[in-house]
Amino acid sequence: MSKKKGLTTTIRHLLEYATVLLLISTLKFLTAKCIFRIGCLVGIFTYRLATKRKQIARINLDIAFGDSKSDKEKKQIIKSSFIQMAVSALQSLWIAKYPNRVHQLIEEKPAGLDILKKCIERRKGVFFLTAHYGNWEIMGIYHGYQDTCKLHSIIRPLDNPYLNKMAMKFRTVSGNGIFYRNDSLLQIVRAIKNNEAVA
């Protein structure tokens, strides 16, 4: 990488980091309901602008569902996905400085905790096979406050080192752990042997 390109990348990373810090400082004064409403508006706005992403989503839905879903249903799924992504991002920024706010976003006790506790009692560790449904960042933090078992998420580090450091702190704030995807096999084995959970 040339010095000029390296400097450009560093400046871009710093600008991205500064933007996120500004958003956190601004959003922290709002209510959970307000964050949700703004997220919906941002999601709709992004949906209308992101032509290429919509095309990719449509191709994937055509492969997954074929003709079993109508054109209208597929468009609604794509639109809802954009809205959910925007809401999830803003909610994560909203709780960044105040992680206990997660309880305002998940008010009901999650189903299946009894099953998890039975698995932990067997002392063989737990694997979670999860999908990116809903706000998985919030759910991970919420799990850390449930006093069940330590949860390790397998992730790819962010390209921006400043945001990656911030994300690591955010994701581990309630006691969870993080494994990087490319070097996590031995760590996974150790976690399972320690009767912990891996997702």
Language-model segments: residues:
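Catalytic core of membrane glycerolipid acyltransferases/transacylases, capturing the structured
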Residues: 122-182
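Conserved Motif II region of HX4D acyltransferases
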Residues: 61, 125-129, 188-199
